[in-house]
Amino acid sequence: MCEERKKLLEIKHLKKYFPIPRKITEVLSKKPQKSVKAVDDITLDIYEDEILALVGESGCGKSSFARTIIRLYDPDSGQIIMDGKDITKMSKKELRPLKRNSQMVFQDPYSSLNARMMVGDMLKEEFLYHHICEPSEVDGKIKDILEKVGLSDDAIDRFPSEFSGGQRQRIGIARALA
């Protein structure tokens, strides 16, 4: 007998369009607003223990799709169902507990890290914002996560500029795990 897999994420007909700015003459002549179809009617399911890789040409909508799924962008239409809950119309407050389970690891790690913050402070911010553990446990949790991604404790007191590109990618993964 086949065991039923748990569906973690269900995307139904998701669309996200970005308006193209119009020239003043187009506004005055009442020409219709044109838009870039960054995400155009995507439907897919992701099940427990699956990994999804978005692959495509530069500018084809991969990042826009991911940002729309985790609601950094509001979708124009469609549904995003996470763990059986339709998050498409949820407020930021309602989304907060769900965002704990959905994090992005950006392909350019340097641009996603705050150059003025030490790695330990960035990770601490994640733990405190999401109320993951008691404040007294945070330092130990940070060391554990850094170890999981292959970085030593000395990373805690260093800035992103002091790391290689691969190490910065691991810092991004550590933030997602936190």
Give the residues covered by each predicted segment.
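Hydrophobic anchor residue at the start of the ABC signature
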Residues: 173
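The feature captures the beta-strand-to-loop junction immediately N-terminal to the Walker
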Residues: 55-56
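Conserved ABC ATPase signature
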Residues: 159-163, 167
